[in-house]
Swiss-Prot record:
The keyword Nucleus applies. This is Nuclear rim protein 1. Residues 560-572 have a biased composition (Low complexity). It is a multi-pass membrane protein. One of its GO terms (biological process) is regulation of exit from mitosis.
């Protein structure tokens, strides 16, 4: 953990720091000051002085501690060791040493102690003549009162007696150690898992059914799968309390998984009980060393190498499956890119929109805290540097807005207009009138010509949405209303559409009139075009009734039946009943 930091005044700079106690935005203190004290002490103490001080402090602490404190210290140091990493470096040599030590004990017992057993255990002091005054009066028994010469002459027998006692102690100690190791390996390490969401019972021999309401309930099946002492206790002492297994609506399954540690497995494989009990109940010679070595190697290969490697391979496969599921299913669903935005929602807004990094979501990985001064601290953990970084605060956007293909073509072909035009509808609204309805140039809702006056203003409010046309033919002439930027001739489109409005198909018929009234006259002229950029020719004006009849000249095969029926359809007489004579419209077809 780093030392005390003094952060820079520029908030844009990223400052590497750890999770710390923040006094203010520019001042932090580490949560664990022991590392800081250790680093600061290096400036005042040398390595030798620090070493002596540490040992002296440890010795003083050891002398002033109670026995229970010593027990806690030893237990904590023992549990803090990662024994699984020492399976091959410590457990295997230790188990092999114990196996060959037991072989040596049995070899000495069968070949050294057993032939001299009658000399070691014979009764040398059947009668003590020195304790009887009557026997001491006879000269014949006086020679048996001095036994010092006999004891010094039989030193070999005394040595064998001491060796026999030592071998018996080692024999019992190794047998007990192997028995405890076998019991711990087979019955000492289990983990219990509760399955609350399994509708069907899994196929497992270690599965028991538990009740959610009565925690003391144990079925007969559960008792039969317990230990021998549990079975005896329930059979003779608590037989009446054992209930039959009854199906209930609310229950769960419990699996008792056998999981010995790798260190214990390696010790069991290198000090197997089969080899120990084989040597305990058979006469041992040097030839017996061959089956002992073979048994030990076979146990190590089957139990530790094959079985442990199989578990590691299965874990690797499961991790690969989980990683594939995470990358293909979970990440696309749960890691959607988000972005915070601030948009002006007033009726007279000026298209104000601003984007911010998505810090409000739970998946952003940003830790937001407050200092003692009330400053908001935003920190994010950097996997590359393995440290926390201060996130710069500001109003600028950190995300990239990606446009679609049509939008990229539109922005690259047409110049950007600062005024807002949505779906091709240019809207004129007085900001002070709070009128949200669009104002078009045509009387019947048809948008006006693309040549707008310089004094016309546009509104930032949204226009009515209408479906975009999709070009179904890559033909030079685009007959859609306003063209289609995804296909067609862009040269003709850009030459006619000077204002760069996006393509839009309006809901009005192309045969509706575009009526322009002049001052002091009732004459109107009807437009049969919709300002398409691909009009090739126009007809002459009808001079009698002062109407303009605009038609589209194009190959007949290029138009669909729906387009022909739309462009060649007749006008209802009711539409022109209030605008003059019906004879001014084109003939019916």
């Amino acid at each position: 953990m780093p030392k005390h930091h003094t952060f820079a005044t520029k908030l844009e700079d990223l400052v590497l720091t750890s999770m710390s106690f923040r006094m203010s935005k520019h001042q932090a203190h580490p949560i664990e000051p022991e590392d800081v004290i250790r680093e600061e002490s290096e400036d005042f103490y040398s390595d030798e002085e620090e070493y002596k001080e540490t040992w002296s402090r440890w010795a003083l602490q050891l002398l002033s501690s109670s026995p229970y404190d010593l027990y806690l210290i030893v237990n904590e140091n023992f549990e803090s060791i990662n024994w699984d990493l020492k399976a091959k470096t410590l457990a295997r040599p230790l188990g092999g040493t114990m196996t060959f030590l037991f072989f040596t004990v049995r070899l000495l017992q069968d070949n050294v102690i057993k032939p001299n057993y009658h000399k070691i255990n014979r009764t040398t002091d059947g009668f003590d003549f020195s304790r009887s005054a009557t026997l001491r009066e006879y000269d014949y028994f006086s020679k048996y009162q001095h036994g010092a010469s006999w004891s010094s002459a039989n030193w070999r027998v005394n040595s064998l007696s001491i060796l026999d006692t030592l071998l018996k102690c080692l024999y019992i100690l190794l047998l007990v150690s192997n028995s405890v190791l076998t019991y711990k390996f087979l019955f000492g390490y289990f983990l219990k898992y509760s399955l609350f969401h399994s509708a069907q019972p899994p196929a497992s021999n270690n599965l028991t059914k538990k009740s959610l309401h009565d925690l003391a309930y144990r079925s007969a099946t559960d008792v039969s799968r317990g230990s021998l002492w549990t079975l005896i206790r329930y059979t003779f002492f608590q037989r009446g309390r054992v209930q039959e297994e009854k199906p209930t609506d609310e229950f769960y399954y419990e699996i008792k998984k056998w999981c010995p540690s790798s260190f214990l497995t390696a010790l069991f494989a290198s000090f197997p009980p089969i080899s120990v009990w084989f040597m305990a109940f058979s006469d041992i010679t040097f030839v017996s060393l061959l089956p002992v070595i073979l048994t030990q190697y076979l146990f190590w290969y089957v139990i530790f190498d094959c079985y442990e490697d199989r578990i590691k391979d299965e874990l690797a496969i499961f991790k690969g499956m989980a990683a594939e599921y995470n990358n293909k299913v979970m990440k696309p669903k749960l890691s959607a890119q988000t972005q915070d935005a601030m948009v002006d929602a007033t009726m007279y807004g000026q298209e104000f929109v601003q984007f911010y990094p998505s810090y409000s979501t739970a998946r952003s990985g940003v830790f937001i805290t407050h200092s003692l001064c009330g400053d908001v601290i935003k920190e994010k953990y950097n996997q590359r540097t393995k440290a926390f970084e201060d996130i710069p605060t500001g109003s600028h956007s950190q995300n990239i807005i990606r446009y679609s293909r049509n939008e990229r073509l539109y922005h690259s072909v047409f110049p950007q207009n600062p005024l807002k035009k949505i779906n091709g509808a240019a809207m004129s609204v007085n900001p002070m009138s709070f009128n949200r309805s669009p104002t078009y140039g045509g009387r019947y809702g048809t948008p006006p010509s693309r040549s707008h006056g310089s004094g016309q203003t546009y509104s930032s409010t949204s226009a009515p949405t209408s479906p975009m046309l999709k070009n179904r033919r890559a033909i030079p002439t685009d007959h859609s209303t306003g063209g289609n930027i995804s296909g067609g001739n862009y040269v003709e489109y850009t030459s006619n559409d000077v204002h760069g409005e996006p393509p839009r198909r309006h809901s009005t018929s192309p045969l509706k009139r575009d009526i322009t009234s002049s001052a002091g006259r009732e004459d109107n002229h009807l437009a049969f075009g919709v300002n398409s950029p691909n009009i090739r020719s126009r007809t002459v004006d009808v001079k009698k009734n002062l109407h303009t009849h605009t038609t589209v000249v194009c190959p007949k095969s290029d138009l669909d039946t729906s387009q022909l029926s739309s462009k060649q359809s007749s006008i209802s007489p009711f539409k022109l009943s209030r605008r003059g004579s019906i004879e001014s419209r084109p003939p019916f077809r």
